Amino acid sequence: MATFKDACFHYRRLTALNRRLCNIGANSICMPVPDEKIKGWCLECCQIADLTHCYGCSLPHVCKWCVQNRRCFLDNEPHLLKLRTVKHPITKDKLQCIIDLYNIIFPINDKVIRKFERMIKQRKCRNQYKIEWYNHLLLPITLNAAAFKFDENNLYYVFGLYEKSVSDIYAPYRIVNFINEFDKLLLDDINFTRMSNLPIELRNHYAKKYFQLSRLPSSKLKQIYFSDFTKETVIFNTYTKTPGRSIYRNVTEFNWRDELELYSDLKNDKNKLIAAMMTSKYTRFYAHDNNFGRLKMTIFELGHHCQPNYVASNHPGNASDIQYCKWCNIKYFLSKIDWRIRDMYNLLMEFIKDCYKSNVNVGHCSSVENIYPLIKRLIWSLFTNHMDQTIEEVFNHMSPVSVEGTNVIMLILGLNISLYNEIKRTLNVDSIPMVLNLNEFSSIVKSISSKWYNVDELDKLPMSIKSTEELIEMKNSGTLTEEFELLISNSEDDNE
């Protein structure tokens, strides 16, 4: 039985604040929602279930019941999931705020127990104190939290009562315990005080549950990668040829400087929290999805679908425009891909084609060449530490000759103006040389691959990990979407 879910169901009738905070989706009607086939704890109701992706952060951390409420731990609306969320670093004051939160929302005292007794003993068969009827009173205060690690300094902890055990290898979070950062004896005393108000029949169950959960060892934190995010929230703009992502957040006009101020209002100004929840709006943010994780994924797919036969062909057009040649056609893949990747692929394949045909005697794209597997490896190695080694292998497969102790290859360019300008810019020359050494060849390949992408400035993960305040600020400043999305292509092929 999910004690936290039961506590939310019964305690929601206690106060006006509880009616807002304890209204979770797990206690409502289930709606059909596809799940991610990942078993884990739902962060809103703390029960073990099949998880589905959240519309706020695109990570699977809610069950098919709670996803109906559209709540995310990155919202700025002070709902219960947000109140249980603490950002790194963890301090003793923040842990004390979590304990105060439990005592305010889920108190255990004589008045509360008598009220629940009157509610439960409406039937004659419910005179005894059985766990099935009083499970909501067996809610110990623990400092276990689900930890999300976006990077070394960007971590979020969602505190809750995570009962039982489950293999969370595919879940985006790990369960950690902060009892040592607080004070074991002090936390024991807090729970013993709560337990002393319970009927004798329930105290043993409370104590057993508390000691089992409060002494759990912490799991090793899991680094979140791009593959952990769902594809359901990704939107490909066919007009601008750029990927984007829909992010939905609960936004309120009330602001708090930090978490401590929010918890202070929870204790001293509950009406402010109620007003914030009543006036919050479910807001959609459309953000670009240009990040290093997506770049690596797209490069991997490009290498898989790449047709290296193009470097031996006589096609006059770009590699992405070939559609009637069974050895070179890749248009089916590039029709829904970022236009920058498409441009990079065209320039890279054209450059290798010009170099290869200038040095090796080849006839047609149907011929079998030893360089084909290397071209796939070259694309896969872009933006990795193996790039220099692969470029050298490609260079050595173009029959270089030694001139004064330096291996060089010939270069007879075709009619690609974009490639011509790119080589001039890279080598900083007025006219294109007809002979290239390894360093010049490598510089051109790296320049083509990094023409549109500065890896050092790219975020590692999607924009959906940003806080709601950051999204609002970026939207107001116009940086939520890219400047490239204003690009209008005049290519007849792009407008088909």
From Swiss-Prot:
GO terms for molecular function: metal ion binding; RNA binding. A motif (pLxIS motif) lies at residues 486-489. Residues 1-81 are annotated as: RNA-binding. One of its GO terms (cellular component) is host cytoskeleton. It is found in: Host cytoplasm, Host cytoskeleton. The keyword Metal-binding applies. Residues 42-79 are annotated as: Zinc-binding domain. Its main location: host cell. It comes from the Viruses. InterPro entries: Rotavirus_NSP1. Residues 321-496 are annotated as: Interaction with host IRF3. The integrity of the zinc-binding domain in NSP1 is important for degradation of host IRF3. Interacts (via C-terminus) with host IRF3; this interaction leads to IRF3 degradation. Interacts with host IRF7; this interaction leads to IRF7 degradation. Interacts with host CUL1 and CUL3. Belongs to the rotavirus NSP1 family. Plays a role in the inhibition of host innate immunity by inducing the degradation of key host factors required to activate interferon production such as IRF3, IRF5 or IRF7. Associates with components of cullin RING ligases (CRLs) including CUL1 or CUL3, which are essential multisubunit ubiquitination complexes, to modulate their activities. This is Non-structural protein 1.
